[in-house]
A protein has these predicted regions:
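Immediate flanking context of iron-sulfur cluster ligation sites
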Residues: 6-34, 41, 45-67
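Conserved phosphate-binding catalytic cores of ATP/NTP-utilizing and phosphoryl-transfer enzymes
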Residues: 85-100, 230-263
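Glycine-rich phosphate-binding loop of actin/hexokinase-like ATP-binding domains
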Residues: 114, 122-135, 139-140, 201-217, ...
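N-terminal phosphate-binding loop and adjacent alpha-helix
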Residues: 133-174, 297, 308-311, 385-388, ...
Length: 498
């Protein structure tokens, strides 16, 4: 897509934002992430120091620039890459006008997931997946809180609200508004503040206090400033600043509080929430893992949407891939990333310290390519981000087990959730070092439990009782302040084969 940019004291990124076009800017626009690239079609933009960090000389000569650093002194036409977003996926026929529905919503830091669910059967009828437009203000919640405090709060609230509203409109196409009985929302605590149009300043500084984050029912028009639906909205309860209602909903869906055995739950989103325990007691924490395991912040990364590479393996000396819904590859999601890095480590393409082996050309591991197409790769910066994310999660798991006074062998089941894709291989998890081998072999992938739990929270009669029980019996702690976390984090940066 080509865009005409006028001469201005403002950056290309700023001008695009003012038109409602939200390029990813994981760093918030300070030139340190390299995600807001554009290509000059006509005109001139000077090369900046930040451009030289992220682009080769050939790319610079081809006109690639970082939009956040490009200040146009004359008119220029730039090409921006269209962000891949899944539309509506039909699971079942919506049926007759007699059917009643609930809309389940999972507001993630990186992705938005919504489902139209048959209220009687609990079966999803339609699913909508979107990128969270707030990605333009940073990849993680801390960066976004900072941007909100610097004056961007109103626009950050508005673009989130409008993206959700547009997705809801698509979901209910062809369905009478009286058939929609309610909207049930699960999200992390920061997204809850943004949705309710509350400044999240207290979430970004010690002691990270929260207010009024219990279960709440609100009119649709109050939240979305639009009355095309007249049903209530149910906001599910958050535990604290770091354990949101997405985790609470996920545990509800898994019937976590009915488990006799010690179970470890990992929601592998940008915030990396972890819970261990059983029906009698639970301990929870979160780790700032970043969006890499959701495909965010990677050169060819994306969520688990149709066309995303979700599995990678070696067969007869050649890389093989599958994609979500068997569509032509357009990027790579979390499960594909885990497979690719684990395979690269096993084959010696990726060294223990995370560097690409010298025999890998182009400073990138090519996952897939086609004649005349853009190859899908993991470059050195991608691998570093994956390295940091896996180390944060691995160290957090070990701290959590210590806090709960448990050994790995005492945990009988490990449940992984989040926007990985369609599956995860235990062998890849162990090779990557994301989990100890003892836990990796006990793991299973449960998909988007927050989204499924949001529907359960509306449909199940015992939902509120179960969620309140979890809030009462759960203790939390700060992983970053836990003794030994930094040492564990440094130790697990290495891709040590287990």
């Amino acid at each position: 897509m080509n865009r005409l940019i006028s001469p201005s004291i403002y950056s290309v990124l700023h001008q695009l934002r003012s038109r409602g076009e939200w390029l990813p800017a994981d760093c918030g626009g300070d030139g340190s992430c390299g995600r807001c690239g554009v290509q000059i079609v006509e005109g001139h933009l000077p090369v900046t120091d930040a451009d030289r960090l992220f682009y080769s000389q050939n790319k610079l000569e081809a006109g690639f620039r970082l939009a956040c650093q490009a200040i146009p002194s004359t008119s220029v036409v730039v090409q921006i890459q269209e962000q891949p977003v899944a539309g509506i996926q039909e699971q079942k026929d919506a049926g007759t006008e007699k059917i009643r529905f609930v809309i389940a919503v999972d507001i993630g830091t990186t992705t938005l997931a919504l489902q139209l669910v048959n209220e009687e059967t609990g079966i999803p009828v339609r699913t909508a997946l979107r990128l969270n437009p707030q990605r333009a203000f940073g990849a993680d919640v801390i960066t976004r809180i900072q941007k909100a405090m610097e004056g961007s709060f109103e626009i950050m609230h508005r673009i989130l609200r409008e993206e959700l509203l547009n997705a809801i409109r698509e979901l209910v196409t062809g369905i009478h508004e009286n058939q929609v009985m309610g909207v049930s929302v699960a999200c992390n605590t920061t997204m809850r503040y943004f949705l309710e149009k509350r400044l999240p300043d207290s979430l970004g500084r010690h002691p990270y206090s929260v207010e009024d984050v219990g279960t709440k029912y609100l009119p649709f028009s109050t939240v979305f400033e639009d009355s095309f639906l007249s049903c209530p909205i149910k906001l599910l309860p958050c535990l604290d600043a770091f354990i949101g209602s997405d985790v609470v909903a996920g545990l509800l869906h898994l019937n976590f509080l009915q488990k006799q055995k010690e179970t470890l739950f990992l929601d592998m989103g940008t915030n990396g929430e972890l819970v261990v325990g059983n029906k009698h007691r639970t301990v929870a924490a979160s780790a700032a893992a970043g969006p890499a395991f959701e495909g965010g912040g990677l050169s060819c990364g994306m969520g688990g949407i149709p066309g995303a590479i979700d599995a990678v393996w070696l067969e007869r000396g050649a890389l093989q891939v599958t994609t979500v819904e068997q569509l032509p590859p357009i990027g790579i999601c979390g499960s594909g990333v885990v497979d690719a890095v684990a395979l690269g480590r096993n084959q010696g393409w990726i060294l223990e310290d995370g560097r690409l082996a010298e025999r890998i050309t182009g400073n990138a591991l090519e996952i897939w390519s086609s004649v005349g197409g853009t190859p899908i790769v993991l470059d050195q910066q991608d691998i570093r981000k994956i390295q940091m994310a896996k180390s944060a999660i691995r160290a957090a798991v070990e701290c959590l087990l210590q806090a709960a006074n448990l050994r790995a062998e005492e945990v009988e089941e490990v449940i992984l959730a989040g926007g990985f894709g369609t599956h995860l291989r235990p062998r890849s998890l162990a090779t990557l070092g994301l989990l100890p081998g003892e836990l990796a072999k006990k793991s299973r992938f449960a998909g988007n439990t927050a989204l499924a739990g949001a529907a359960d929270a509306w449909i199940r009669n015992d939902a509120d009782i179960c969620m309140e029980q979890f809030l009462r019996q759960t203790t939390t702690f700060s992983v970053a302040e836990f003794p030994g976390f930094q040492s564990l984090f440094m130790t697990h940066l290495a891709f040590s084969l287990e």
